[in-house]
């Protein structure tokens, strides 16, 4: 029999190709995690051993050592019988002795087996009474690094079987395409799991490094391929899976903060969606509560929560005349503003969970987005607006409020106020022309929708400050508002920075400016906390007005980016 060839020629080929592949693929791999996965796969010792065997067999195959005959053992038997009929001599006796040795007989038998290619195992015949529906078993071997497997398991309460509950998108199990929801788990690395709890199996998986071998019974249920496009949502609440008692696997949960943009990877489960942070290079998804499930949980908790309303001051509202801070006591807020049906398709003020969003970038021909400023009395909204107008009066504009009071001698119609009759004001209220309105000393004051449109029509950025409960009615396709919450600093900083400042006190009948009091500071902090707690999910940005110049510069930078950069907006604004 010809010997196996040796030399460098047989050490080339597939083995060296596998060794060089990771370096060759590096420029084409998107993430470091994928590259690490490739290094782990191609660096497996068992894979290298198989490749070496393949190379040796390949070199042997090239020599094409065809057998001279396929029955060497039978030929030896015939020769022995023939020689026994001959007159014996020393050579015949030596040959008969050699052919009778067990080692020689075994060698000839192996030769015939290889020559006849009859070395494949012979399977036993299929029993006649076999059950056609008997479960088939599949052996799966996955190679993973330190990342989680990316699958959750559960125990069937009726059968006691351990099954795959879900496959996390982008995880090792998902990328392999070998494990599916509903598969029954029988063994992990040779360890039977029929009598184990899911927690014990998870511990086995977490302790396994490198390759993991599964013995499973495939699910008979066919999976429907997901046809979902890219869906992005804005989180309207904070979430920490470690504090969620309902989540099936805390390690598989995805934490997020209010305002984060998430990409939905799967909505197959009505209770738990799979998502990842937008822009995250990590392909693995995590579990988050679905919109329906979160709304239901919040609705069930609502009777136990005491929501503290914004404290209403008396009819002598501070800063009322110039900033249109309507009387908190007698103020009536328009509940059905123009186009509010569109904005209420997603009523975030009731149960804030998620809002579907899409990227938006203002085009040159588009009107500017409405800038809505929200903040407690005394925080500095008017001063910030004044500085913005002074910085560029041609670019920024403010609305002129309507009133039914008599015009004073030093006032001009359309400058300080738009003066209209009480009958016309009430008519406009009935046809939903006011964003918000109220009554002060038997006179009506209000901010009309037409005033906002008038500023935007002049190709200016409209600066509008309103009460926070009005914001949701402004969130329409027409205005595309960008809401900024001006937040006060700590009360210690207020005492330091506002000790010489003045406020129009609500306790002064004349509405004259007086120095801040300790009560004013406390009221400002308390109002800001309530605003952020109840309406924070509607705010696009929060700016702390600790130093007026710093706050103004941050505000100005925000506006500049708003006009040029891409931002996330409700999908209804672009697809209405």
UniProtKB/Swiss-Prot annotation:
Entries under Pfam families matching the protein: Guanylate_kin, L27, PDZ, SH3_2
Phospho-regulated basic and hydrophobic (PRBH) motif as annotated region, ranges: 289-383
InterPro entries: GK/Ca_channel_bsu, Guanylate_kin-like_dom, Guanylate_kinase_CS, L27_C, L27_dom, L27_dom_sf, MAGUK, MPP7_SH3
Entry's Gene Ontology molecular function annotations: molecular adaptor activity; protein domain specific binding
Modified residues (Phosphoserine): 409
Keywords linked to the UniProt accession: Cell junction, Cell membrane, Cytoplasm, Membrane, Phosphoprotein, Repeat, SH3 domain, Tight junction
Any one GO biological process: bicellular tight junction assembly
Topology within the bilayer: Peripheral membrane protein
Repeat keyword on record: yes
CDD domains according to UniProt: GMPK (cd00071), PDZ_MPP3-MPP4-MPP7-like (cd06799), SH3_MPP7 (cd12033)
Chief location: membrane
Family annotation (PANTHER family): MEMBRANE-ASSOCIATED GUANYLATE KINASE MAGUK
Protein name: MAGUK p55 subfamily member 7
The species this protein was found in: Mus musculus
């Amino acid at each position: 029999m010809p010997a196996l060839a040796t030399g460098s020629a047989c050490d080339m080929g597939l083995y060296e190709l596998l060794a060089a592949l990771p370096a060759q693929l590096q420029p084409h791999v998107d993430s470091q995690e994928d590259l690490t996965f490739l290094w782990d796969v191609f660096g497996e010792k068992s894979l290298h051993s198989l490749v070496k065997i393949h190379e040796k067999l390949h070199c042997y195959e090239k020599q094409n050592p065809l057998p001279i005959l396929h029955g060497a053992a039978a030929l030896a038997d015939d020769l022995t019988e023939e020689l026994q009929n001959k007159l014996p001599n020393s050579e015949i006796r030596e040959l008969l002795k050699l052919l009778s040795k067990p080692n020689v007989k075994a060698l000839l038998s192996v030769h015939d087996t290889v020559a006849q290619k009859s070395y494949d195992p012979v399977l036993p015949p299929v029993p006649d009474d076999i059950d056609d529906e008997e479960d088939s078993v599949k052996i799966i071997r996955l190679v993973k690094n330190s990342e989680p497997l990316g699958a959750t398991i559960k125990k069937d309460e009726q059968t006691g079987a351990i099954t795959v509950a879900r496959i996390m998108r982008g995880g090792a199990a998902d990328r392999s395409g070998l494990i599916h929801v509903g598969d029954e788990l029988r063994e992990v690395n040779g360890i039977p799991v029929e009598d184990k709890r899911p927690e014990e199996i998870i511990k086995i998986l977490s302790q396994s490094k490198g390759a993991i071998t599964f013995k499973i019974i495939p699910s008979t249920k066919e999976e429907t391929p997901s046809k979902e496009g890219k869906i992005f949502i804005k989180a309207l609440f904070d979430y920490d899976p470690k504090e969620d008692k309902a989540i099936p696997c805390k390690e598989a949960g995805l934490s997020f903060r209010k305002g984060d943009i998430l990409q939905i990877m799967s909505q197959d489960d009505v209770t738990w969606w799979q998502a990842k942070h937008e822009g995250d290079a990590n392909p693995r998804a995590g579990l988050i509560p679905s919109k329906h499930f979160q709304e239901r949980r919040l609705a069930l908790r609502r009777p136990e929560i005491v929501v503290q309303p914004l404290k209403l001051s008396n009819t002598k509202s501070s800063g009322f005349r110039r900033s249109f801070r309507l009387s908190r006591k007698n103020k009536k807020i328009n509940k059905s503003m123009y186009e509010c049906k569109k904005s209420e398709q997603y009523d975030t003020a009731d149960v804030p969970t998620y809002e579907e969003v899409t990227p938006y970038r203002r085009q040159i021909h588009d009107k500017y987005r409405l800038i809505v400023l929200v903040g407690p009395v005394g925080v500095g909204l008017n001063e910030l607006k004044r500085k913005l107008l002074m910085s560029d009066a041609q670019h920024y504009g403010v609305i002129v409020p309507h009133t039914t009071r008599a015009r004073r001698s030093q006032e001009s119609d359309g400058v300080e106020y738009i003066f209209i009759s009480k009958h016309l004001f009430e008519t406009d209220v009935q046809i939903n022309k006011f964003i918000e309105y109220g009554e002060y000393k038997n006179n009506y004051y209000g901010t009309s929708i037409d005033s906002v449109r008038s500023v935007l029509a002049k190709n200016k950025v409209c600066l509008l400050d309103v009460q926070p409960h009005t914001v949701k009615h402004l969130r329409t396709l027409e205005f595309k508002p960008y809401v900024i919450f001006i937040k006060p600093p700590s009360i210690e900083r207020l005492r330091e920075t506002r000790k010489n400042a003045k406020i129009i006190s609500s306790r002064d009948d004349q509405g004259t400016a007086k120095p801040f009091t300790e009560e004013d500071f406390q009221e400002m902090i308390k109002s800001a906390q309530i605003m952020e707690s109840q309406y924070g999910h509607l705010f696009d940005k929060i700016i702390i007005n600790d130093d007026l110049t710093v706050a103004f510069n941050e505000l100005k930078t925000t506006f500049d980016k708003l006009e040029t950069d891409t931002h996330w907006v409700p999908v209804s604004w672009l697809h209405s």
